[in-house]
Amino acid sequence: MAHKKGTGSTRNGRDSNAKRLGVKCFGGELVHPGYILVRQRGTKFHPGVNVRRGGDDTLFAVATGIVTFERYGKWRKKVSVYPVEAAAQ
Protein backbone atom coordinates (compact mmCIF):
# COMPACT_ATOMS: atom_id res chain seq x y z
CA MET A 1 0.00 0.00 0.00
CA ALA A 2 1.36 3.42 -0.98
CA HIS A 3 2.30 5.91 1.69
CA LYS A 4 2.42 8.85 -0.75
CA LYS A 5 -0.59 10.08 -2.66
CA GLY A 6 0.94 10.21 -6.18
CA THR A 7 -0.23 12.54 -8.94
CA GLY A 8 -2.76 10.47 -10.85
CA SER A 9 -3.57 11.05 -14.49
CA THR A 10 -6.47 11.68 -16.78
CA ARG A 11 -7.05 11.00 -20.44
CA ASN A 12 -9.62 13.75 -20.81
CA GLY A 13 -9.10 17.50 -21.04
CA ARG A 14 -9.16 18.07 -24.80
CA ASP A 15 -11.70 19.71 -27.05
CA SER A 16 -11.68 20.56 -30.74
CA ASN A 17 -12.06 24.07 -32.08
CA ALA A 18 -15.47 25.08 -33.43
CA LYS A 19 -15.61 24.73 -37.24
CA ARG A 20 -18.08 27.59 -37.78
CA LEU A 21 -20.37 25.60 -40.04
CA GLY A 22 -23.84 26.63 -41.15
CA VAL A 23 -25.74 28.90 -43.50
CA LYS A 24 -23.77 32.05 -44.35
CA CYS A 25 -26.20 33.72 -46.81
CA PHE A 26 -29.89 33.38 -46.08
CA GLY A 27 -32.91 33.21 -48.39
CA GLY A 28 -33.71 36.48 -50.16
CA GLU A 29 -30.16 37.86 -49.96
CA LEU A 30 -28.41 39.25 -53.03
CA VAL A 31 -25.14 37.41 -53.69
CA HIS A 32 -22.34 37.63 -56.23
CA PRO A 33 -20.10 34.91 -57.72
CA GLY A 34 -17.80 33.37 -55.13
CA TYR A 35 -20.01 34.14 -52.13
CA ILE A 36 -20.11 31.22 -49.69
CA LEU A 37 -23.72 30.21 -49.09
CA VAL A 38 -23.40 27.20 -46.75
CA ARG A 39 -20.47 25.62 -44.91
CA GLN A 40 -21.29 22.00 -44.17
CA ARG A 41 -20.01 18.48 -43.66
CA GLY A 42 -21.67 16.13 -46.11
CA THR A 43 -24.65 17.24 -48.19
CA LYS A 44 -27.25 18.59 -45.79
CA PHE A 45 -27.97 21.08 -48.58
CA HIS A 46 -27.54 20.14 -52.25
CA PRO A 47 -26.43 22.59 -54.95
CA GLY A 48 -29.18 23.95 -57.19
CA VAL A 49 -29.22 26.52 -59.99
CA ASN A 50 -26.05 28.67 -60.18
CA VAL A 51 -24.57 26.95 -57.11
CA ARG A 52 -21.54 24.64 -57.00
CA ARG A 53 -20.09 22.38 -54.32
CA GLY A 54 -16.48 22.73 -53.17
CA GLY A 55 -14.12 19.98 -52.09
CA ASP A 56 -15.15 20.32 -48.43
CA ASP A 57 -18.89 20.30 -49.40
CA THR A 58 -19.14 24.10 -49.12
CA LEU A 59 -21.82 25.57 -51.39
CA PHE A 60 -20.92 28.77 -53.24
CA ALA A 61 -22.58 31.02 -55.81
CA VAL A 62 -21.42 31.11 -59.44
CA ALA A 63 -23.74 33.93 -60.56
CA THR A 64 -25.20 37.15 -59.20
CA GLY A 65 -28.73 36.73 -57.91
CA ILE A 66 -31.10 36.03 -55.04
CA VAL A 67 -30.58 33.04 -52.73
CA THR A 68 -33.48 30.60 -52.36
CA PHE A 69 -33.77 27.44 -50.26
CA GLU A 70 -36.06 24.81 -51.82
CA ARG A 71 -37.32 21.29 -51.17
CA TYR A 72 -35.60 18.74 -53.39
CA GLY A 73 -37.47 15.46 -53.37
CA LYS A 74 -39.09 14.23 -50.20
CA TRP A 75 -36.21 14.63 -47.76
CA ARG A 76 -33.59 16.80 -49.39
CA LYS A 77 -33.05 20.56 -49.58
CA LYS A 78 -31.25 22.52 -52.24
CA VAL A 79 -29.87 26.03 -52.47
CA SER A 80 -30.26 27.99 -55.70
CA VAL A 81 -29.27 31.46 -56.87
CA TYR A 82 -31.71 32.96 -59.36
CA PRO A 83 -30.56 35.94 -61.46
CA VAL A 84 -31.97 39.31 -60.41
CA GLU A 85 -33.72 39.86 -63.78
CA ALA A 86 -35.54 36.54 -63.48
CA ALA A 87 -36.43 37.22 -59.84
CA ALA A 88 -37.94 40.62 -60.73
CA GLN A 89 -40.44 39.08 -63.17
UniProtKB/Swiss-Prot annotation:
Task: Give the domain of life.
Answer: Bacteria
What biological-process terms (Gene Ontology) are attached?
translation
Q: Which GO terms describe its molecular function?
A: structural constituent of ribosome
The UniProt entry, under Pfam families, shows:
Ribosomal_L27
Signal sequence interval, chain numbering: none
* Record's keyword annotation contains Ribosomal protein: yes
Q: Which InterPro entries match?
A: Ribosomal_bL27, Ribosomal_bL27_CS
Q: Which GO terms describe its cellular component?
A: cytosolic large ribosomal subunit
On whether Magnesium is a keyword of this UniProt record, the answer is: no
Enumerate the UniProt keywords alphabetically.
Ribonucleoprotein, Ribosomal protein
Q: Which family does it belong to?
A: Belongs to the bacterial ribosomal protein bL27 family.
- Record protein name field: Large ribosomal subunit protein bL27
Which species expresses this protein natively? Synechococcus sp. (strain JA-3-3Ab)
Q: Which gene encodes it?
A: rpmA
